[in-house]
Amino acid sequence: MRYNQFSYIPTSLERAAEELKELGFDLDLQKTAKANLESFLRKLFFHYPDSDYPLSHLIAKNDMDALSFFQSEQELSKEVFDLLALQVLGFIPGVDFTEADAFLDKLAFPIHFDETEIIKHIHHLLATRCKSGMTLIDDLVSQGMLTMDNDYHFFNGKSLATFDTSQLIREVVYVEAPLDTDQDGQLDLIKVNIIRPQSQKPLPTLMTPSPYHQGINEVANDKKLYRMEKELVVKKRRQITVEDRDFIPLETQPCKLPIGQNLESFSYINSYSLNDYFLARGFANIYVSGVGTAGSTGFMTSGDYAQIESFKAVIDWLNGRATAYTSHSKTHQVRADWANGLVCTTGKSYLGTMSTGLATTGVDGLAMIIAESAISSWYNYYRENGLVCSPGGYPGEDLDVLTELTYSRNLLAGDYLRHNDRYQELLNQQSQALDRQSGDYNQFWHDRNYLKNAHQIKCDVVYTHGLQDWNVKPRQVYEIFNALPSTINKHLFLHQGEHVYMHNWQSIDFRESMNALLCQKLLGLANDFSLPEMIWQDNTCLQNWQERKVFGTSTIKELDLGQELLLIDNHYGEDEFKAYGKDFRAFKAALFEGKANQALVDILLEEDLPINGEIVLQLKVKSSENKGLLSAQILDYGKKKRLGDLPIALTQSSIDNGQNFSRESLKELLFREDSYRVISKGFMNLQNRNNLSSIETIPNNKWMTVRLPLQPTIYHLEKGDTLRVILYTTDFEHTVRDNSNYALTIDLSQSQLIVPIASN
């Protein structure tokens, strides 16, 4: 374990003493440091009628237990404080460590003993993570140190788990959205699942906009998947034009219906554990799936601003600007009289994507988004540089396939009976509009590009993204983060994992940092919390997170690729082509080991190479035919220990998100020995070699200069490492599988790898 503590708010002695007193700690500035520490420790054992017994189970020195120490005349020293602090946090002498000083250095322990600062040390210790993954104060509250009185209690600028999660209110309302996405002449109704504590105070809201939450149709999804085996189409030379179109909602009328009290209820919904953490701390949770999902009406428009509007309507309702009904019969309305109107959205992938879309509307009431692994341009999710390009792990998927997966109205047999014919008509229109034939950018994709509206974002923004996420690739967060207005507060956590959540990792206090931010933004708490704009997980060592100023630098280093002419054959034998088509992982293994059709260049680094931004391959290329698909991957190559990309459970159910509520496992990315690590990758239709809007012809056997931008990253390579550059055509995971008989030639003497370099 190593501490990377970003959530602790430095506190004055007076404020620290006041907060400790509010928690019931009997500390006195006039007492000695030793007496205050003893009083603090005894309070920790509030379950025991006699605190001598648990105190005797701690050691103050290697030859003296804590009870004996406090009964002695010996003075408090750094050695004693450090040893006791480690044990209070759950570290066991002789098991987790033998030499405390060396262990503290390894931990990067954030508290440095000074006898005159004992009150502040105790305050800091309570806000520090235990071995279990919880802060000490959260651990104590989870054991019942504070009663669940359904009121707010704060410590170090963060809300504590004092809301009773055994008496939660679970209710359903139906919000009227200014939409008619299925064109039935009726405004769409949006189902909203609400979970909130019983409280006399107006509550802020965490909203998870999740098209998955009312169920998914995997059968329809699988039937809709596309075959990837097809020839790369030769496109006509042309210029693509699109226009920015404002979304115009339909008019709604003020509701004059009586207020209803008899609301629909529910017993369970698949919740997000970060939401659960905040539910116990006085934040209502709502789950909304939007248009075209079970319990709602309308068509699944998948990614456009009509879908975004269906979530925006819920925020409008929370602020009294939209109508909600008690049921589909619309006989009574219901008001959000329990809400303070301030909202933060949460969730990963599609969920985080909807958060970004919502933020670009500038809707009042949306105070903050926590968007994890989020899409900012749907074109860049299903296409790349004029190519159909599947997200990593999902060959054959497209946006209409996702529509089939998430149109959960068809899971309700009655809805299927009444509406499926119309749904199929609208789905067919969507399938035509996305233009899978060419892979080109068009108006359909432009309407699903949130980057063009990034300037309208006014809420606080928190993004997390994995630099090994080849599903929602790093370009998605790179472009939106760098497009955000300079006037807003923005934060980015870049980790070394894949498409994963990170709130329950051991090495980073993400949960507590979000607590401090949300208390500021949604509860108006003046806690003086300041979070760095960007925090990056170091790829060279375990559990090390560093502040970074920018994602993408202008300083570059050009690496020569060689002097040869290299030929890349596109065609595979029939058996090999079929085998790779059945198992793209076998293709990837062959590719990375230099066994697939490719041009391969290994560069032995003579000095460290700290990459920060978008690597570009500038290549001299020619094709034997009037078409060409170019793929590239950059590897950190050679056997060594690297961080894995999937977090591993260190302990089971050790994190309590409330008071015995919604427990979850503590996880972390661990080192493993492997032969390579993908640093970046990219794909291009050579007909789109100059830009996305220009489709050009490819002259047979004529040299072309191509700039292929790869996925942005931050990655540190060290002197002596090998950088492997792989150039090839068909990628059996991502691109169409064209097995026609053409070849590309690369002139390495006129080609370079252009690398953005991080400053010291």
From Swiss-Prot:
Its EC number is 3.4.14.11. InterPro entries: AB_hydrolase_fold, Galactose-bd-like_sf, Pept_S15_Xpro, PepX_N_dom, PepX_N_dom_sf, Xaa-Pro-like_dom, Xaa-Pro_dipept_C, Xaa-Pro_dipeptidyl-ppase/CocE. GO terms for cellular component: cytoplasm. One of its GO terms (biological process) is proteolysis. It catalyses: Hydrolyzes Xaa-Pro-|- bonds to release unblocked, N-terminal dipeptides from substrates including Ala-Pro-|-p-nitroanilide and (sequentially) Tyr-Pro-|-Phe-Pro-|-Gly-Pro-|-Ile. It is found in: Cytoplasm. The active site is at S349 (charge relay system), D469 (charge relay system), H499 (charge relay system). The keyword Transferase does not apply. Keywords: Aminopeptidase, Cytoplasm, Hydrolase, Protease, Serine protease. The keyword Amino-acid biosynthesis does not apply. GO terms for molecular function: aminopeptidase activity; dipeptidyl-peptidase activity; serine-type peptidase activity. Removes N-terminal dipeptides sequentially from polypeptides having unsubstituted N-termini provided that the penultimate residue is proline. Homodimer. Belongs to the peptidase S15 family. PANTHER family: COCE_NOND FAMILY, PUTATIVE (AFU_ORTHOLOGUE AFUA_7G00600)-RELATED, PEPTIDASE S9 PROLYL OLIGOPEPTIDASE. This is Xaa-Pro dipeptidyl-peptidase. It comes from Streptococcus pyogenes serotype M6 (strain ATCC BAA-946 / MGAS10394). The gene is pepX.
